[in-house]
Amino acid sequence: MVFSKDLPSPATMFSTYASLAGYIMMIKPMIHTIIPRPIQNFVFSYIKSFVGSPQAYLSSKISPDASKLRMTRDPNNKNVNLHLSQGEVVSDVYKGIELKWRYLEGRNKKTTVVGEETEEAIVNWQCFELSFDKKHKDLVVKSYIAYVERKAKVIKEERRIIKMHSYSSYTLRWQSVKFEHPSTFHTMAMTPKLKSSVMEDLDRFIKRKDYYKRVGKAWKRSYFLYGPPGTGKSSLVAAMANYLKFDIYDLQLANVQGDAQLRSLLLATNNSSILLVEDIDCSVDLPTRLQPATTTLGAPKGSTPLTLSGLLNCIDGLWSSCGDERIVIFTTNNKEVLDPALLRPGCMDMHIYLGHCSFEGFKILASNYLGMPHDSDDPHRLYPDIKRLIDG
């Protein structure tokens, strides 16, 4: 065997290979440790969505003639979900094309080397096999798959469980519970004009993803609810969440130890959600740009305190673009004491005043509590007197 003088010797090559192999064996287990868990969860959830979309779509296509099905139900969900079993086939038709979906699942043995120890684990996998005539490949790839994604999104939204998230200063992360507030726009004691205005604004926001992208703005909307105590501000937030099927993130500014932690909390929220800051006038004393900032009690030494500038940057600045389909809601009983920077149109898109009950609102309450129709042609005999007393 002849070696070129430009090539390293066999001993050098073997030494390099041994070092490289040892380096790879050392790095491999470190990947699971170095990569943050949220990134791993994001990657896994992204991969899982490729299976979840066909699964949701096909759940509405399952034939009664299927020989074997799987039935599941989440403990927090009232809906029963039907899924295909191993090898079951579902037929579909799209623009005259016949397609067949087949569900497959299995398990593989995975070996992981950690230091000098070898760990073995069983990894379950599942997938859907889609078959069709190859002459329709372009239509299926460019049109049908997107159609399945859209239909699956609608089905998932109908079955979605709304959650209420709160920040835990003990675990330093968001914790959630199932949100079961019964408030809806139908039961809200609001004037019909205001109610329609809010609902139309929400509908317009949801449908304008392309518009926000075209004008170069973050896909978000902010609402400022103000009025006397007990006039339905929290109930309106619940009605908005139930109407849109959005999760709620209840942010207590008093528990936030600085601008950096506020940014981290907002980055940990999901899309299609509501960020709620209740009673912002009394939750924390936010120093303005002209006031010296003081460190929050209990904050780590050297940390940046929570400031009005930091809050505005997260709501309407560069950090507000980190996410899509977000809604921000501030509530207060005393609008006059807030800094004007929080109330400007660029920060709060819609101001909603919730005052004391009007006569129209009273009729809705009478319908809710007493079962009296509020739009009847034959109103109650006391309604004229009640209207006179409420209107003053």
Curated annotation (Swiss-Prot):
Record's subcellular location = Membrane
Which species? Answer: Arabidopsis thaliana
Q: Which cofactor does it need?
A: Mg(2+)
Q: Name one GO cellular component term.
A: membrane
InterPro entries in the record, alphabetically?
AAA+_ATPase, AAA_N_dom, ATPase_AAA_core, ATPase_AAA_CS, Mitochondrial_chaperone_BCS1, P-loop_NTPase
- Family of the protein in this entry: Belongs to the AAA ATPase family. BCS1 subfamily.
EC class name: hydrolase
State the Pfam families in the record.
Answer: AAA, AAA_assoc
Q: Organism classification, top ranks?
A: Eukaryota, Viridiplantae, Streptophyta, Embryophyta, Tracheophyta
Q: How does it sit in the membrane?
A: Single-pass membrane protein
Q: Which GO terms describe its biological process?
A: response to stress
Q: Does the keyword Protease apply?
A: no
What protein name does the entry list? AAA-ATPase At5g17750
Q: Which reaction does it catalyse?
A: ATP + H2O = ADP + phosphate + H(+)
Q: Which GO terms describe its molecular function?
A: ATP binding; ATP hydrolysis activity
